[in-house]
């Protein structure tokens, strides 16, 4: 097996550091940190790069620590526990901003990027919002082994690894893992969510319910909901600190209405677009339970309560509807990891919407879509990075775009 001594450079999105081999080829080394000298073995060759494995650390980064989790190197969940928490913040911010810089620099012929996005101070202007580094994750999908044990997906494998503890899980889920309870059906999967006290699964609860920023939000245990509740609340509070809502609001990829729910007191009209009919039904219920309780202040405005419209369709088909011709002063867009649908992005760029709040779980697709928005005349006024997923390379981005 080929071995070489290399010095790592920067960390790239995915949490591997890059280094150069003797022949000039780039090698990606997982579990390494920047500026370490390593003896590595080459484990996989590609046309333009290689993958390496650490055999020995010859010069150790001052930021390297022992992983807290005993399953770290086999579990497919975390990949940054080798760095201290503060340095992780720096690494995640660096990786996210590099993805943005790289995507925008591909459009060098468009001077708009130099003016709006590639200024030297952009790194300092981007706001990093942190929360708990451990005991934060409230949602898991576990595999049930043949003996009834809870397992998580094994790293780079179709297999699974039995989990006796998970230090990033909220205490209620950690206690469940430590109890070694084996009451679940072998050779199956189970979705588990905790509000910090209760454990919700598809077996013991039809609905999950949490309270965020004073609102009650219900969703299905099998459906999507954010896994870091404290950071979700910080995200919501930040959005509505900057939102200037006076008329019509569009909630794109709305899910259960998490963001538009908080626009109720200011908007005259709210449109939710979501392809998942089950999630949209929960959105309707969330507006109902909050408007009929103290969750939403129902002081009658001059123009009455806002009208709420639910559109069960995907982003690709939104532009074909008559409602897409309406003028919205605010759009919330929270797409899946693949980013905004091409057709939806085209509509958004030409919509004339005054302010767009783009929430993204992937800095790469956020950067790609940002390029299109900037070309169409929007300015990236604020850029936030919310540390939703400590101990991993993942991060949540909020971009606030405005057009005069």
Curated annotation (Swiss-Prot):
Swiss-Prot/TrEMBL GO biological process terms: rRNA base methylation
Active site residues of this protein: 361 (nucleophile)
Enzyme category, top tier: transferase
Keyword Mitochondrion carried by entry: no
Keywords: 4Fe-4S, Iron, Iron-sulfur, Metal-binding, Methyltransferase, S-adenosyl-L-methionine, Transferase
Binding site for S-adenosyl-L-methionine: 226, 253, 274, 334
Annotated S-S bridges: none
E.C. designation(s): 2.1.1.-
GO MF: 4 iron, 4 sulfur cluster binding; metal ion binding; rRNA (uridine-C5-)-methyltransferase activity
Methyltransferase listed as a keyword: yes
Origin superkingdom: Bacteria
Binding site for [4Fe-4S] cluster: 69, 75, 78, 166
PANTHER family listed in its UniProt record: RNA M5U METHYLTRANSFERASE, TRNA (URACIL(54)-C(5))-METHYLTRANSFERASE
Similarity field: Belongs to the class I-like SAM-binding methyltransferase superfamily. RNA M5U methyltransferase family.
The name this protein goes by in its record: Uncharacterized RNA methyltransferase TDE_2619
UniProt organism field: Treponema denticola (strain ATCC 35405 / DSM 14222 / CIP 103919 / JCM 8153 / KCTC 15104)
């Amino acid at each position: 097996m080929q071995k070489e001594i290399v010095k790592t450079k920067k960390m790239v999105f995915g949490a591997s550091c890059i280094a150069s081999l003797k022949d000039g080829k780039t090698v990606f080394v997982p579990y390494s940190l920047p500026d370490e000298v390593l003896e590595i073995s080459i484990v996989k060759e590609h046309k333009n790069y290689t993958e390496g494995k650490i055999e020995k650390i010859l010069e150790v980064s001052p930021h390297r620590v022992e992983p807290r989790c005993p399953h770290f190197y086999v579990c497919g969940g975390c990949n940054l526990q080798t760095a201290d928490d503060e340095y992780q913040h720096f690494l995640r911010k660096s990786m996210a901003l590099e993805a943005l810089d790289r995507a925008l620099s591909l459009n060098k012929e468009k001077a708009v990027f130099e003016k709006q996005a590639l200024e030297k101070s952009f790194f300092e202007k981007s706001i990093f919002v942190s929360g708990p580094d451990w005991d934060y994750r409230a949602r898991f999908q576990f595999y049930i082994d043949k003996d009834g044990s809870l397992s998580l997906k094994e790293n780079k494998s179709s297999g699974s690894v039995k989990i006796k503890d998970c230090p990033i899980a909220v205490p209620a889920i950690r206690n469940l893992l430590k109890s070694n309870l084996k009451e679940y059906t072998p050779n199956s999967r189970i979705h588990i969510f905790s509000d910090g006290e209760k454990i919700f699964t598809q077996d013991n609860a039809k609905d999950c319910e949490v309270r965020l920023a004073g609102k009650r939000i219900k969703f299905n245990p099998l459906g999507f909901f954010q896994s870091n509740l404290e950071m979700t609340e910080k995200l919501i509070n930040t959005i509505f600190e900057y939102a200037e809502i006076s008329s019509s609001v569009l909630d794109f990829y709305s899910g259960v209405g998490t963001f538009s729910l908080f626009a109720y007191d200011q908007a005259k009209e709210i449109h939710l677009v979501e392809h998942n009919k089950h999630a949209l039904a929960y959105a309707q219920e969330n507006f109902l339970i909050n408007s009929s309780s103290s969750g939403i202040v129902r002081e009658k405005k001059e123009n009455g309560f806002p009208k709420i419209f639910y559109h069960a369709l995907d982003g690709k088909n939104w532009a074909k509807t008559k409602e897409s011709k309406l003028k919205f002063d605010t759009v919330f867009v929270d797409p899946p990891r693949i980013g905004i649908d091409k057709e939806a992005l085209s509509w958004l760029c030409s919509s004339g919407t005054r302010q767009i709040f783009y929430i993204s779980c992937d800095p790469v697709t956020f950067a790609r879509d940002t390029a299109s928005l900037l070309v169409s005349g929007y300015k990236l006024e604020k850029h936030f990075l919310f540390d939703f997923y400590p101990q991993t390379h993942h991060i949540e981005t909020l971009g606030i775009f405005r057009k005069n």
